[in-house]
């Protein structure tokens, strides 16, 4: 009977008081532990932080004494920094305020400097090419079909390699270089520019050639589809199908590549 009476209904008031006491003890112990950990850190901050950068205000003549801390004057432009008394308890908070103001001032000065030095910039997409140096900033990826013509690229690459080898050999020959005239350097630069122009011209011709070839193949496929459709409809005749492009208003072009 006694066991049944104990397990029937607990006293919630007693249980609440016990839990409240335990919670208060835990809070006090955690607060004490946190303060004990924070004390060495604050001492180290007070020792490492620069103190006395504010201006001390003297209200009356009685403050002049041996125990009064000496004022230390900081920079004149620090108008927004807080006054800090050397050796006072408020030195840490004043120092934090002063450092925050200094950081804000530096950030603002940098922002004004960036705004004054801002210039309009045109960003160019520079893509390396296999057969010519990309000094003019032209987008080489806009000419995707040129990648299919390996012989053109090989010719231009070998021409550039030959010019580079010639320049290296000339640089090794010091005596002959000293005997050369002063106009030899511009002539080599002109040769390089001429080779670049030739490579670009060859690329453009190859692109036009490929375009014409693709158009010719497309036209042949269209004619073949038309012939197949007419054959399926039952209209058979070789003479009629030869003139289908003319009937539909498509002139016949002979494929003539560039030479």
From Swiss-Prot:
GO terms for molecular function: hormone activity. It is found in: Secreted. Residues 42-103, 149-197 are annotated as: Disordered. Residues 119-150 are annotated as: 2 X 5 AA repeats of R-L-R-F-H. One of its GO terms (biological process) is neuropeptide signaling pathway. Residues 1-34 form the signal peptide. Keywords: Amidation, Cleavage on pair of basic residues, Hormone, Neuropeptide, Repeat, Secreted, Signal. Its main location: secreted. Residues 35-102, 181-195, 237-259 form a propeptide. InterPro entries: ELH. It comes from the Eukaryota. One of its GO terms (cellular component) is extracellular region. The modification Leucine amide is found at residue 233. Sequence repeats lie at residues 119-123, 146-150. Belongs to the molluscan ELH family. CDCH induces ovulation and egg-mass production; it may also stimulate synthesis of secretory products in the female accessory sex glands and affect neurons in the neuronal circuits controlling locomotion and feeding. This is Ovulation prohormone. It comes from Lymnaea stagnalis (Great pond snail).
